[in-house]
Amino acid sequence: MFQKVEGIVIRTTDYGETNKIVTIFSRELGKISAMARGAKKPKSRLASVSQLMTHGHFLIQMGSGLGTLQQGEIISTMKEIREDIFLTAYASFIVELTDKATEDKKHNPYLFEMLYQTLHYMCEGVDSEVLSLIYQTKMLPVLGMRPYFDTCAICHQETDFVAFSVREGGFLCSRHAEQDPYRIPVGEAVHKLLRLFFHFDLHRLGNVSVKDSTKKQMRLVLNTYYDEYCGIYLKSRRFLEQLDKFQI
């Protein structure tokens, strides 16, 4: 059976001397993998369409196991991302998180649209670090995680938030922050932005400007929470940390 899908390449794996296994997150079927025979050959008709982060239409011969990519038509190569090391790093984080957080052939058009919109914004010049933070926040419920972003994790009141507790699973107000000695102190902007990112419609994203110190706190909160409850290891996250460390 042949299936035509619209999708974005989220992973490629070399297979033998000339072939690739291409993993695509599609609008119609969710995550699917297919053998792209000869795709490593420069003159192959599948060479360009099987590149990481390529957005296109793909014709796949489906089977009980691994499908076979027959042909593809490029919608966008995400050229702006490929030409910038920082954009490539953040986009790689986003597609790897999508890959690790999803199961094969689980239809999720909302997630496809979020992935497409995030990469599209990145190509348009929206702050790539902020986009990665938004995406990481919005992936929490996909992974079955719902931190307390709206109320204090202990008293469940909407009040002044001064810290984030991984142990309690959310923000803490000034009255209860002392109950977790390992709490992460945060500024008011961190709470407001994480709550906003969790709930808002990504299509409504306008001009966004976030202080570097706020982004750093948000990244610490999200990474620490993911490490505790998710158990996903991302190579791309290590690369991002190295970029930040050496300030390339």
From Swiss-Prot:
<dbReference type="InterPro" id="IPR022572">
    <property type="entry name" value="DNA_rep/recomb_RecO_N"/>
</dbReference>
<dbReference type="InterPro" id="IPR012340">
    <property type="entry name" value="NA-bd_OB-fold"/>
</dbReference>
<protein>
    <recommendedName>
        <fullName>DNA repair protein RecO</fullName>
    </recommendedName>
</protein>
<dbReference type="InterPro" id="IPR037278">
    <property type="entry name" value="ARFGAP/RecO"/>
</dbReference>
<dbReference type="GO" id="GO:0043590">
    <property type="term" value="C:bacterial nucleoid"/>
</dbReference>
<dbReference type="Pfam" id="PF11967">
    <property type="entry name" value="RecO_N"/>
</dbReference>
<dbReference type="GO" id="GO:0006302">
    <property type="term" value="P:double-strand break repair"/>
</dbReference>
<dbReference type="Pfam" id="PF02565">
    <property type="entry name" value="RecO_C"/>
</dbReference>
<keyword id="KW-0227">DNA damage</keyword>
<dbReference type="InterPro" id="IPR003717">
    <property type="entry name" value="RecO"/>
</dbReference>
<keyword id="KW-0234">DNA repair</keyword>
<comment type="function">
    <text>Involved in DNA repair and RecF pathway recombination.</text>
</comment>
<dbReference type="GO" id="GO:0006310">
    <property type="term" value="P:DNA recombination"/>
</dbReference>
<keyword id="KW-0233">DNA recombination</keyword>
<dbReference type="InterPro" id="IPR042242">
    <property type="entry name" value="RecO_C"/>
</dbReference>
<comment type="similarity">
    <text>Belongs to the RecO family.</text>
</comment>
